[in-house]
């Protein structure tokens, strides 16, 4: 029994394992459930072989908000126009259209246009130079000690402090 449970659990967690025999048939990447009939507050999104893929109102709202606010820069112009015109049509047609568009969306990094500040959590130092990270470029944090500060103050070739990074401009939706 001790060996049977981990094997069964690992099989249940795999993506393509059929779990219909215990009544846990899922659809829409685990957000929906396959049923004969959807409840009053649920919406039918797809077909599960002979059943309907039913999704609750929270999942519908989550998908709608993600498509409206999370991916406006990723979608091409045709899809954006279709989404705008779909607001006037029935909710079922809109959801079916949104779900057909989901596989076409390219994955992008949410943090692609954002600069991060690295703050070291190491031992206490006298001073530290903190640098920003730009996409595709790796920078390292350098720390200076008292002896390095005295040498750089005495030398005539000490470099000026680095210029501040450009202001971060994010597109507004």
From Swiss-Prot:
Residues spanning the signal sequence: 1-19
A GO CC term assigned to this protein in UniProt: extracellular region
Ranges of Pro residues composition bias in the record: 159-173
Entry annotated with the keyword Signal: yes
Disulfide bonds: 27-53, 34-48, 38-54
Biological processes, Gene Ontology terms: defense response to bacterium
Major localization class: secreted
Region annotation Disordered: where it falls in the sequence: 144-173
Name of this chain's protein: Beta-defensin 129
Species the sequence originates in: Hylobates lar
The gene coding this protein: DEFB129
